[in-house]
Design a protein with these regions (language model features):
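A domain-start/cap signature at the N-terminus of enzymes
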Residues: 4, 17-49, 61-62, 75, ...
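Short beta-strand/loop motif that positions the catalytic acidic residue
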Residues: 199-201, 205
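Acidic catalytic loop of the alpha/beta-hydrolase fold
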Residues: 205-208, 284-286
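Acidic, glycine-rich loop-and-strand cores that form catalytic or ligand-binding grooves
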Residues: 220-257
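Catalytic active-site module of serine/aspartate enzymes centered on a nucleophile-bearing elbow/loop
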Residues: 293-310
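C-terminal outer-membrane/trafficking sorting elements
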Residues: 315-390
Length: 390
């Protein structure tokens, strides 16, 4: 369930030492909890808040680099870290499961190496939902927060935790987007209110299976929650959305062996919606525009901000796809777009450092004055990561 980011040009300490991206700790219920905090350099009015929840065994430093800062420079972005979990084997041996959210993930009457080890509910006694809400309370007390724009996204186990927060705290959370993680086996579906939800899942996911959320870990096989389609139907039904979705097929332009389908279910009276992106052939990872037909970060941002994917005419001047090369780059980066586009380059703190207009062909951009590090090139709302390395 751990997502591994291969960003070699930006050391994790760069984020920790940045004026806008800092590592924080909070004393919560007798435990020192850790999280990464990104505050806009120049706030403009009330700020939305986004929580990013990592997968099993991951950490907040690693997962803080999804790239939302480039798309949403006025958002506060918080990446909390889960606590370590252990699995007791017959009370004799404790197996370290890595960092895990108390999201109701587990199963009943499980066996390991031929021995019955009973029920497992990872980190059952940890109050992770209280920790997340305590961070939100602190932000509301210290900043001008847009309380109508509180979002959570999570990958794998972070997706399970996102759905738990949606079920239990719709009064505080505006919308969630879960990726490769559904609703945990031990988490009852008893929502406190309607909430917009998005789910993204690959049909070939072997870590959290598409059909039944089957999970295999160190020889322990268990169904840990709802399958992908069952989760979407559960939220669609609760939100009383139409049974007939708006279907959007993403253009298949990359040679990645994948196709992406989006299903949007709406409740026209309340405005609530449930969105599902089905990744045919997709596995347990976070897909990005550099190599794939869509970029998860961009699609989640569009969902949170109410932007919808609709078919565009051939005359549209919006760059539907663009590529960058070389990447990493040293002094020159080439940007190829299929239509006219406005390009912006943002640094890792979300500050725009360059803006260029293109004519739909290949544009060479001089980046020699920019220091080494992680950047984001954004073309009409679509972002790609760029590493500058010399």
């Amino acid at each position: 369930m751990k997502k591994i980011f291969t960003i070699v040009a930006l050391a994790l300490c760069t984020f920790a030492l940045s004026a806008q991206n800092v590592e924080r700790t909070m004393e919560f219920e007798g435990t020192t909890r850790k999280y990464m905090e990104h505050i806009p350099a120049t706030p403009n009015g009330s700020m939305p808040v986004l929580f990013q929840l990592h997968g099993l065994g991951d950490n907040c430093n690693n997962f803080s680099q999804l790239g939302f800062e480039a798309l949403a420079p006025n958002w506060i972005i918080i990446t909390p870290e889960a606590t370590e979990a252990t699995i007791s084997i017959m009370g004799i041996y404790n197996m370290n499961a890595g960092t895990a959210w108390a999201a109701g993930v587990g199963g009943e009457n499980l066996s390991y190496s031929g021995f019955n080890i009973g029920d497992i509910n990872l980190n059952e006694g940890v109050n992770d939902e209280g920790f997340i809400l305590a961070i939100l309370d602190s932000l509301e007390n210290n900043f001008d927060i847009n309380t109508d724009s509180i979002f959570i996204t999570g990958f794998s186990m972070g997706g399970f935790m996102s759905n738990k927060m949606a079920v239990k705290h719709a009064d505080r959370i505006t919308a969630i987007a879960s990726v490769s993680g559904t609703l945990g086996h031990f988490q009852p579906f008893e929502p406190t209110g309607n909430i917009n939800t998005m789910h993204i899942h690959g049909t070939s996911d072997e870590t959290i299976s598409y059909a039944n959320a089957d999970f295999n870990f160190n020889g322990i096989a268990v169904q840990v929650g709802l399958g992908a389609e069952a989760l979407v139907e559960t939220w669609r039904n609760y939100n009383q959305c139409s049974t007939e979705p708006i279907v959007y097929n993403f253009e298949d332009t990359k040679n990645d062996g994948l196709t992406f389908e989006q299903y949007t279910y709406k409740n026209e009276e309340t405005g609530n919606k449930t969105v599902f992106i089905k990744v045919n052939g997709g596995v347990h990872t976070w897909y990005e525009a550099a190599r794939n037909d869509i970029d998860y970060t961009t699609e989640i941002y569009k969902f949170f901000t109410g932007q919808e994917n609709v078919p565009t005419s051939i005359e549209s001047n919006v760059a539907e796809n663009f590529s960058i090369y070389p990447n990493p780059a040293a002094n020159i980066v080439n940007v190829k777009t299929d239509r006219n586009a406005e390009l912006s380059i943002f640094n890792a703190t979300g500050k725009e450092v360059k803006h260029i207009s293109t004519n739909g062909n290949t544009t060479s951009i001089d980046i020699s004055e920019l220091p080494n590090g992680l950047y984001f090139i954004v073309a009409n709302g679509i972002a790609q990561k760029l590493t500058i390395e010399r």
